[in-house]
Amino acid sequence: KSFAQLRIPLKPDFWLPILGDTSIFSNEENSADYKEFVKGFVLRSSPDDSSIAGLNLSNNSPLNITVYYTNLTGNVQDSYLIDIGAIRSSEFMHDYSNTPVGDVLGQVNTDFAYIQSMQGVNLSVDLSSVKTLENTIVNKAQLEFFLLEETDPLVDPVAGLDVLFINENGTSTQILDSSLSNTSADYLGGSLESTVVGGQTLRKYELDISNHVILIARGEIENPIISIEARNKPQRATRSIVLGQSHPDFPMRLKLVTSKP
């Protein structure tokens, strides 16, 4: 049985001298010298804009990189196998030049914002205003924003969200409401859900960040910036365009239920 393969020609002017070097390529397969010389391979698509290649990296498929060549008679010579093994990782690099996403990167109070999975962008929200609630009881704090419905979306919208912040040690960590959701009831929420507003059926995200807002208001957390990202971000390609703080009809908002002590 022949398994699915991706065959990529190597440049002869670079590889022929190497293949003939017995200090690198010995007669033994899986030469240790070869593995020391060749640390790995980088695959890039051409053209590099709007291109993606998909590889099955499950443990149920044979995952090997093999370098082989033929002699003058056409016979395949010794192949040198690289077993990818059970631990794998992927890195995605995005070029946002001349894109709607690139136009709003680093901007505040925009009409639209973007959340992507994989190596895509997150949404940053500044909660500095809640520091004025120092002497106020915060009963509930919810961040609400609506999804822009695309006519012909390339990928599905993000199904669920997580919220993180940079702590005093400089480490990105889940807010308390997120970590509580991991151990018991779903405190955070963050799933995409339908709602009717003014006769229109819309889809929105609602994040209960009450505990985190209280900690900022008390001064127990100094950094007021939170990062909203796709839940299980590395697992599948998703993207959501959401209505931002400056959207004229359905702006992003922080809903607070408070009382005086």
Mark where each language-model region is.
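Secreted, disulfide-rich extracellular signaling modules
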Residues: 1-261
